Amino acid sequence: MKQIIPYGKCYIDSHDINEVKKSLKNSYLTSGPFVKKLENNIKKKLKVKYAVSCNSGTAALHLAFISIGLKKKDIVILPVINFVAASNILKMMDIKIIYSDVDINTGQITPAAIEECIKKNTLKKIKAIVTMPLGGFPENIEQFYKIKKKYNCFLIEDACHALGARYRF
């Protein structure tokens, strides 16, 4: 059976509503036990050592860009189809953006397109590549890791659309 999952439609059940009620009745405005529980659940699910929650994907991207030490005039490759937050933050930081073409079927950046961007900018070192699993469909992240290693740059996966999604099962 083929099931269509509508883009942008949320599924909220009674459990979700009850958790929000508990959070609102809690005396913490920020941080607190619910945030710690979320971060611990994400660490467990993704099998990572650290997880820091943010109030938005935009804030998370900003933290990621700061954490890799981006400086003015550094170069970052972004997919041409992307949420505007990444571009806005990089522009605010005075970072040069190279927009990469995307696959016509998936709307996602491809390893071949990244290689093409890098070849066109041979005199400049690429500081980071940002991928985005558009619509919740994870890309072949292993190929991007190979490119990251080959060019000694950072790889940031903007997983707002696909947190917890897996490429291989």
Regions found by a protein language model. Give the residues of each.
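Glycine-/small-residue-rich active-site loops that bind phosphorylated ligands and cofactors
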Residues: I12, T30, N82, N105-T106, ...
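Phosphate-binding glycine-rich loop
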Residues: Y28, G32-I75, I89-M93, Y99-D101
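Generic structural signal for small/hydrophobic residues in well-ordered secondary structure
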Residues: V20, I42, A60, V76, ...
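Conserved PLP-anchoring active-site segment centered on the Schiff-base-forming lysine
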Residues: A64-K124
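Active-site phosphate-binding strand-loop segment of PLP-dependent enzymes
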Residues: N105-F169
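N-terminal "arm"/small-domain region of PLP-dependent enzymes with the aminotransferase-like
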Residues: M1-L29, P33
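Conserved donor-binding loops in enzymes that form glycosidic bonds
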Residues: K9-C10, D101, L134
